[in-house]
């Protein structure tokens, strides 16, 4: 054993000094991150929790948000899994792995629904906060910039707020990790030497809660 350690022999896969960031760069186009989100809703008998699923692809930072529900049963989750797989196919994306935490809402039937699409489930190991850092950061900003500022009174109300933020994030909001392009953009914007104030177009969502500025088309 001492000889093996002295010679630094390695068994199995070759190990190096790669970090988790290096690993994500290798598998960023096939490793999806998944998490449940809850949002209180005012009902006749008081506050109840609505739940929905957020799935994010680290390679492009593109995300997907499911409709909300009061009951996250296997039938509901199975439908959401099929929906996101269909959308991924339309965008020529290949979710080979879905990494999730050990939340009890992820039942065996949920895993079966995901695996039926051809993807494999990877569960969080204990005390590993960085394994799904991208999706958790998105959920944090979703709550801080949108959901925490809205009093939800119906499921359609919750869906509208979440999906407006989803559209803003995927198609409008610049992302530093993508050279300040939104996750849904595949090509950079046309470069201009100067931009006049009259060329800037302002738009908003949710009554001005989400703001967006862009250059008008030439």
Predicted feature descriptions by range:
Residues 1-218:
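Charged DNA-binding/catalytic regions of mobile-element recombinases
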């Amino acid at each position: 054993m001492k000889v093996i350690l002295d010679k630094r022999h390695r068994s199995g896969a070759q190990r190096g000094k790669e970090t988790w960031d290096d690993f994500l760069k290798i598998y960023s186009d096939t490793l999806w991150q998944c998490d449940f989100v809850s949002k209180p809703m005012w009902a006749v008998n008081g506050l109840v929790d609505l739940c929905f699923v957020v799935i994010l692809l680290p390679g492009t930072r593109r995300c997907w948000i499911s409709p909300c529900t009061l009951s996250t049963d296997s039938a509901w989750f199975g439908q959401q899994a099929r929906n996101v797989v269909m959308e991924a196919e339309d965008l020529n994306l290949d979710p080979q792995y879905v990494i999730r935490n050990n939340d009890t809402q992820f039942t065996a039937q949920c895993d079966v629904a995901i695996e039926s699409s051809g993807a494999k489930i990877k569960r969080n190991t204990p005390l590993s906060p960085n394994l799904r850092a991208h999706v958790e950061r998105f959920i944090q900003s979703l709550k801080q910039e949108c959901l925490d500022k809205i009093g939800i009174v119906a499921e359609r109300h919750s869906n509208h707020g979440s999906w407006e933020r989803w559209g803003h994030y995927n198609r409008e909001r610049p992302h530093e990790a993508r050279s300040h392009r939104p996750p849904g953009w595949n090509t950079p914007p046309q470069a201009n030497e100067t931009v006049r104030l009259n060329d800037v177009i302002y738009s908003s969502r949710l009554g001005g809660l989400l703001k967006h500025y862009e250059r008008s088309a030439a």
